[in-house]
Amino acid sequence: APAMGFQGVR
């Protein structure tokens, strides 16, 4: 999973 703040960008 991506880092926090980049949840929309996988």
From Swiss-Prot:
GO terms for biological process: neuropeptide signaling pathway. InterPro entries: Lem_TRP. Keywords: Amidation, Neuropeptide, Secreted. The keyword Nucleotide-binding does not apply. It comes from the Eukaryota. Its main location: secreted. GO terms for cellular component: extracellular region. Midgut and brain. The modification Arginine amide is found at R10. It is found in: Secreted. It holds the Pfam family Lem_TRP. Myoactive peptide. Increases the amplitude and frequency of spontaneous contractions and tonus of hindgut muscle. This is Tachykinin-related peptide 5.
